[in-house]
């Protein structure tokens, strides 16, 4: 796998809104690093040249014009690189040929996918191919689901260090989240709803928390679809709109790590609303509203000021032996754009540079990059993983 290539990774979708942010981050962080060779790829060479000029991309950085409707063009791009970083979603509409080409060619792949139906299909379709060729495919390398997947891993490592065993009851609690929701997330949800009309069997995939867990059927999971009072934290909590993908990814990570969290592991994610009547009212409001209704259109996004003023703070609670271990993951920019663009960039670098012993297959972030990626995110990307008690 990964014979001599021109590039460590290619940013596919570099002329889109999120792709430009990835490019901007790479220029800021790695333009003077000769050990990291990357290229920009997209459908229009003139637009690529414009992005390269506006973002001060170092001269000599590759610009690859790729026709997304031409398999030969896609394969030409894949042949030049060790890894494809793609921001072009919804992936069920625009990701099939890219991920298939990577799997068949033994090339690594990272994306921002939060589409469990499509992921389920690709896991079934491409796992054996990826294992044979050595391709490491890692879905969900943005806000869905890195802070949650790695947050649970970070928590379980601390619980196991203290008690010699993991917590089988973990709660993810979003304490703060400021920033515009991703237009790509909204578009992916729309594409999933459309796919359900053509493939009603996807309902079962979306409803099953273990649908990405390689056939494993775990215990009933705690409810997360209506407001509840979390008495251990003394607060009302509301349904969190990203829980349907994050929880599936966390359970997949557990399965891929030989059930490191236990076969009876339970996990849910909810949004902290506060105590008392005000907290209950806020939880009721959130549960009846659509947080994605005002999301930007795909290709659009928030201003630099909005991105830089955004942030998020997620608490993870692991119950064990009548105690509860608390850790947090905090991000320094808006989750859907600023932080996401940094997370996927660091994922590509980590996968190619620090995970050379990882076998081919289809992964989530925790079992593929794990603590190596946690360190990179803390050192470079503005994330903080903290033990709180």
What does each model-identified segment do?
Residues 19, 157-389:
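C-terminal catalytic/substrate-binding lobe primarily of soluble NAD(P)-dependent oxidoreductases
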Residues 7-30:
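N-terminal Rossmann NAD(P)H-binding glycine-rich loop of SDR-like oxidoreductase domains
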Residues 25-35, 257-259:
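A short, Lys/Arg-enriched amphipathic alpha-helix followed by its capping loop at the start of a domain
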Residues 31-47:
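Conserved glycine-rich Rossmann-like NAD(P)H-binding loop of the short-chain dehydrogenase/reductase
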Residues 90-211:
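Glycine-/Pro-rich loop/turn segments that contact NAD(P) or position catalytic residues
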Residues 8, 82-83, 108, 325:
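Structural motif
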């Amino acid at each position: 796998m990964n014979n001599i290539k021109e590039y460590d990774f290619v940013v596919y979708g570099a002329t889109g809104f999120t792709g430009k942010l990835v490019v901007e981050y790479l220029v800021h962080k790695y333009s003077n690093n000769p050990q990291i060779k990357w290229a920009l790829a997209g459908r229009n060479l003139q637009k690529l040249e414009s992005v390269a000029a506006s973002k001060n991309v170092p001269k000599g950085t590759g610009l690859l014009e790729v026709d997304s409707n031409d398999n030969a063009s896609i394969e030409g791009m894949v042949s030049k690189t060790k890894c494809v970083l793609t921001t072009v979603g919804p992936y069920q509409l625009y990701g099939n040929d890219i991920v298939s080409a990577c799997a068949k060619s033994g090339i690594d792949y990272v994306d921002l996918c939060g589409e469990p139906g499509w992921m389920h299909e690709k896991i079934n379709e491409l796992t054996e191919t990826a294992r044979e060729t050595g391709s490491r495919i890692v879905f969900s390398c943005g806000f869905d689901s890195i802070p949650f997947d790695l947050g649970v891993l970070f928590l379980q490592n601390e619980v196991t260090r203290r008690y010699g065993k993991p917590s089988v009851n973990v709660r993810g609690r979003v304490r703060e989240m400021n920033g515009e929701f991703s237009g790509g997330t909204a578009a992916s949800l729309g594409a999933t709803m459309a796919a359900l009309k053509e493939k009603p069997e996807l309902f079962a995939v979306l409803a099953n928390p273990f649908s990405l867990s390689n056939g494993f059927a775990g215990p009933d999971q705690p409810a997360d679809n209506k407001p509840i009072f979390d008495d251990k934290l003394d607060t009302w909590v509301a349904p969190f709109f990203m829980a349907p993908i994050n929880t599936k990814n966390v359970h997949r990570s557990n399965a891929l790590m030989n059930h490191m969290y236990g076969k009876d592991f339970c996990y849910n994610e909810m949004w902290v609303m506060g105590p008392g009547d005000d907290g209950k009212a806020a939880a009721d409001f959130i549960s009846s509203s659509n947080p994605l209704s005002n999301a930007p259109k795909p290709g659009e996004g928030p201003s630099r000021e909005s991105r830089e003023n955004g942030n998020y703070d997620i608490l993870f609670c692991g119950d064990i032996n009548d105690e509860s271990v608390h850790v947090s993951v905090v991000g320094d920019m808006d989750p859907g754009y600023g932080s996401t663009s940094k997370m996927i960039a660091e994922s590509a670098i980590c996968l190619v540079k620090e995970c050379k012993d990882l076998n081919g297959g289809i992964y989530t972030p925790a079992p593929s990059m794990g603590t190596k990626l946690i360190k990179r995110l803390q050192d470079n990307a503005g994330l903080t993983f903290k033990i709180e008690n």
